[in-house]
């Protein structure tokens, strides 16, 4: 179900809780909402739809064809190649803001089947994931 986007900076600055299998409907809602905003958005975290759970959804361009991916409880366990960039966010008013990102990251997460996976990401997809994991950690750009 498509949800309304959250714009309250106090709510967005709160850390998200661990997601469980009972939270899978939130994951679907997040994906539905991201796809509804696909013209202007490439990633979302659950707190952006008012749910403080560690769930992210994003456009994954790391494979042969772009696909939407959902991760539960993502943790960046390794990062390399720091660079400065600017990013925008649908949750925040105003234009792009400066931030630091990494060219390559290794992420440990759970799938929708609650299986733990570890995967490396680079480039644009890595940047999107870092932005959404920041949301889970209560960090706003």
Language model: regions and residue ranges:
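Positively charged
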Residues: 1-141
